[in-house]
Amino acid sequence: MRGYLFGILSAVFWALSGLLYNELPLSEYTALGKVISLLFLIDFCSLLVIGITLWRKSAVDFQGVFWQPALSGILGGPIGMSAYLLSIHYLTIYYAAPLSSLFPVFAALMSYWILKEKITKTAQFGFALAIISSSLLAIEVGQEITFNTIGFIFLIICILGWSSEIVISSYTMRSLSGLQVYFLRLCGSTIGYLLILFILSLKNFSLDILSFNYVQIAGVIIFGALSYCCYYQAIYLLKPIKAMALNITYSVWAIGLGYLLYKQPIKPITLLLTLLLSAGVIVTLYYKGEQK
């Protein structure tokens, strides 16, 4: 039961973080530097909190494992996360969130071939329904905005980065706990962000995020950190397929919370696709091909 709760919370927190980020005033020139600065703060703060937690639990023995989860952090963080937030900048959260939720398709295929995870036909149907509904939702929501090629490229990079991260992290969790893997993942992503920030500073990119509203910045950082922490716990407790099935509902939460917080209208077709996506998730959750 805890695994399902962590999965749902990861989606809710991710939606809130994306919505707050969507409201930040970013110009095209300042976007990259400020996005990387923001992501660095999210992961650095998370690294400190998780590190202290593991130290207090005397769980700092990583059994010689470092490079695999660190690599997953680079793929999911500096590469995947940067691309995701930049896609929000170019396409808005209402288009980027649903379409980016296609990453489980690639992760599921990788899990099947690399991790040898079994997927029953019922689960395949539910998972396919969730993914197809999410894709149609992205198309429907995106009809009212101008499609941006750069934003689409960032989305592809995001999907590839996230799917690779989830498979590598899941493999590492065969020998370490979810929090331990998350800590090592944060080590990799933090180092990656620092390297990118150093390069951007040499190119005179703006790295100043203090011009933003402090409440918004705090919200993006806190909700983003909580989302990732819950996500990794869900992966550890439920395995990748179920954790991803819950996590991809962030597109639904983003649309629903966008309506409640920012009065973003929801059309009937959007509601229908949302229900279909939820149905696909429910079917996936109850398959018996993977034991908890």
UniProtKB/Swiss-Prot annotation:
- This chain belongs to the protein called Protein LicB
> What Pfam families does this protein's entry cite?
EamA
- Looking at the keywords, is Repeat present? yes
Q: Which residues form the EamA domain?
A: 70-139, 160-286
A GO cellular component entry from the record: membrane
Has the keyword Repeat been applied to this entry? yes
Task: Fill in the misc note.
Answer: Lipopolysaccharide (LPS) is a glycolipid that is a necessary component and antigenic determinant of the outer membrane and has been shown to be an important factor in the host-parasite interaction in a number of Gram-negative species. H.influenzae is able to display an extensive repertoire of different surface configurations through variability of its LPS oligosaccharide.
- Coiled-coil residue spans: none
**Species of provenance:** Haemophilus influenzae (strain ATCC 51907 / DSM 11121 / KW20 / Rd)
Q: Which UniProt keywords apply?
A: Repeat
Q: Which InterPro entries match?
A: EamA_dom
